[in-house]
């Protein structure tokens, strides 16, 4: 079942085989090439986690109580407002891998939250998705912690090969999707939404049972997936990724982390989303080029490429690398 070419019926649930190539089934920002992100960012607009969770909450998808903070004092005020004696402090950048890079800290007490906020704000966080220069941290998300019993992976995205909106799910939550695909390809579940009828409740239930959820949790997952599909369609999104989707000690489902990408081509009718764009996360050269309507991707090599298509660009870079160059 090669996910790049398989044209199975939209209503069927199927598993990715161990031999399948996962590239076209992965969320766009997850695909990398020689350490450089290969997604075409000039057609995608990333949101910060706190912005993504606000959208999820708007569409009835459970998220932990939390608020953004732009200074150390504001972080402490948010902690007081949330209450409790423990919090999670999350650096807000447009890249994954924050936890492994020290960008997510669990703290107890006001002195600890002050120290954590001070250590993150004003720095540049380097993860496996940012490149060596990292990305600036000028805002934080302060949340109440949750007691997690199990973590799952759930994403809604456009599969270009199938030309359909698809959902990808896995029991191996909390891991990068590339890692899941490499280590547990048989644990990745995929359902395809019909372009006319949309995602169906029975498909959501099938995913829930495949994940091993209990009856009430299956019902909750169905409601959550249908709400995600509604959000995805109503806001012209390219990706909604929840990793992890957690089962709490009360057997509730909650989105512990969220990533949302918006299709730039739809921003003319999504003005509210356009205003959420944080240009500080853009590469300065890419941002300048975008002002002139140019698609420019900054790389670390010494050979520039001027090409007239994404496919030709990737092939050209492959040839340059093959002959010892650095695009």
Residue ranges and their predicted role:
Residues 44-241, 246-327:
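ATP-dependent carboxylate/acyl-activation modules
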Residues 6-7:
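Alpha-helix boundary/capping motif
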């Amino acid at each position: 079942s090669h996910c790049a070419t398989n044209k199975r019926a939209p209503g069927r649930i199927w598993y990715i085989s161990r031999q399948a190539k996962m590239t076209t089934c992965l969320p766009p920002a997850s695909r990398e090439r020689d350490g450089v992100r290969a997604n075409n960012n000039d057609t995608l607009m990333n949101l910060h986690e706190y912005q993504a969770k606000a959208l999820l909450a708007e569409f009835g998808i459970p998220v932990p109580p939390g608020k953004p903070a732009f200074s150390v004092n504001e972080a402490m005020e948010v902690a007081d407002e949330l209450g409790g004696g423990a919090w999670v402090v999350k650096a807000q950048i447009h890249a994954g891998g924050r936890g492994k890079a020290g960008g997510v800290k669990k703290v107890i007490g006001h002195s600890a939250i002050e120290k954590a906020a001070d250590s993150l704000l004003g720095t540049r966080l380097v993860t496996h998705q940012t490149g060596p220069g990292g990305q600036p941290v000028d805002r934080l998300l302060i949340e109440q912690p949750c007691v997690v019993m199990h973590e799952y992976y759930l994403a809604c995205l456009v599969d270009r090969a199938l030309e359909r909106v698809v959902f990808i799910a896995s029991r191996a939550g909390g891991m990068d999707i590339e890692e899941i695909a490499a280590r547990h390809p048989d644990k990745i579940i995929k359902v395809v939404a019909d372009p006319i009828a949309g995602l169906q409740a029975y498909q959501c239930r099938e995913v829930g049972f495949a994940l091993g959820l209990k009856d009430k949790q299956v019902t909750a997952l169905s409601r959550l997936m249908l709400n995600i599909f509604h959000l995805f369609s109503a806001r012209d999104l390219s990706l909604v990724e929840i990793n992890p989707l957690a089962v709490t000690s009360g057997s509730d489902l909650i989105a512990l982390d969220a990533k949302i990408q918006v299709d730039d081509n739809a921003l003319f009718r999504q003005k509210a989303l356009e205003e959420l764009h944080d240009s500080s996360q853009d590469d300065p050269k890419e941002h300048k080029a975008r002002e002139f309507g140019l698609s420019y991707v900054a790389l670390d090599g010494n050979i520039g490429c001027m090409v007239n298509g994404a496919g030709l660009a990737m092939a050209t870079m492959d040839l340059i690398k093959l002959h010892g160059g650095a695009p």
